[in-house]
């Protein structure tokens, strides 16, 4: 973690820049694609799970869809941020020249197209524990074997055949994207066995 305090590391007209007080964690790009958000999109948040307190979490808006987060944050963003103790009021989207009193810049624990650092497990453990604590006791009973469908996967034209084979083996076929994030966590926590192809659906495991 590069800890930058009382240093100006920018070029430009400081008179026109905004100034942010307090301790700020720079978290990289705010990914709106689900699979990228729960992988490299969370990979700079590990100081939070190490019990370091921050006043704000600063993101760069991704090139596509930044306004959609401001106007209507996706359900999974809200759920995961809440699980990490981050309120939406703490999130800053950097759209203009900005100075910080204290800025923490962690190296990504999961760089894109690379291996994940073990500290990512601490982030996912927080999400898992929050999910379990959010569910009623009767919702934690063991359930079916699940096959996670990839109905929108254009790389396969035999999805119905694959799904039929899993149904014959006693699996319940589900398309997780049809459920709220909390409901997805409930289904996965209930499952005896989960099967599927590599992709966003299995990232939840």
Which residue stretches match the model-derived regions?
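The feature primarily captures lumenal catalytic ectodomains
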Residues: 1-204
């Amino acid at each position: 973690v590069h800890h930058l305090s009382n240093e100006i590391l920018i070029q430009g007209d400081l008179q026109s820049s905004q100034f942010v007080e307090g301790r700020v964690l720079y978290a990289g790009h705010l990914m709106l694609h689900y699979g990228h958000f729960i992988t490299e999109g969370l990979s700079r948040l590990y100081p939070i799970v190490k019990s370091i307190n921050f006043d704000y979490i600063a993101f760069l808006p991704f090139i596509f869809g930044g306004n959609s987060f401001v106007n209507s944050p996706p359900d999974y963003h809200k759920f995961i941020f809440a699980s990490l103790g981050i309120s939406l009021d703490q999130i800053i989207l950097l759209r203009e020249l900005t100075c910080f009193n204290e800025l923490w810049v962690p190296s990504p624990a999961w760089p894109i197209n690379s291996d994940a650092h073990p500290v990512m497990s601490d982030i996912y453990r927080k999400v898992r524990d929050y999910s379990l604590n959010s569910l009623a006791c009767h919702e934690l009973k063991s359930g079916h074997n699940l096959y996670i469908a990839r109905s929108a996967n254009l790389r396969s034209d035999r999805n119905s055949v694959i799904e039929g084979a899993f149904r014959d083996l006693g699996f319940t076929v589900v398309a997780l994207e049809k459920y709220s994030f909390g409901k997805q966590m409930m289904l996965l926590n209930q499952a005896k066995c989960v099967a599927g192809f590599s992709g966003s659906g299995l990232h939840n495991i």
